[in-house]
Amino acid sequence: MITADIFGSLPDGRCVTKYTLSTHGASVSVMDFGATVLSVCVPDRTGAAADVLLGFGDLAGYLDNPACYGSTIAPVANRTDRAEVPLAGRIYHLPANDGPDHANNLHTDLARGLHKRLWSTELFEDDNAVRFSCELADGELGLPGNRRFAVTYRLDKEAQKTARTGACALKWSMSARPTPRLM
């Protein structure tokens, strides 16, 4: 079963929605801001449901979330040496925001990355799943290529949670460019 509730509002007034996938005493809550996992509640050995995920109780915590708890990080997760991405004979520069003297890059862009965006949502009631998707234009966040990112969260009948991520370069023109992805 999937339920949807307003989780809060962004500073620009757009609503953030929390989706809860439930089955047999377990539940997973996710939100469309950052395609973020909010909670994973599972029965303990006595059968009482408990949230086993580290996170925040309200949207404000996720708006200022330097550890990126629960968030989908893309297009590049983790560190990029010297904040440079060599691709197809060219060097692309990302914000230098991490490491000694802030010489490296962490998570593409901590201020404007996909974990700081409202994603589109598609519900799959029959599969007890929700898919979030987000698009980036060529050059956006410092990387080439028109790109679409998607993550699907599913809680099956046996209370097994799965997450699938994916990205693809979109061929919106004859000059589609290569693009990196590390999610």
Provide a role label for each language-model segment.
Residues 1-183:
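Surface-exposed acidic/polar loop and edge beta-strand patches at domain peripheries
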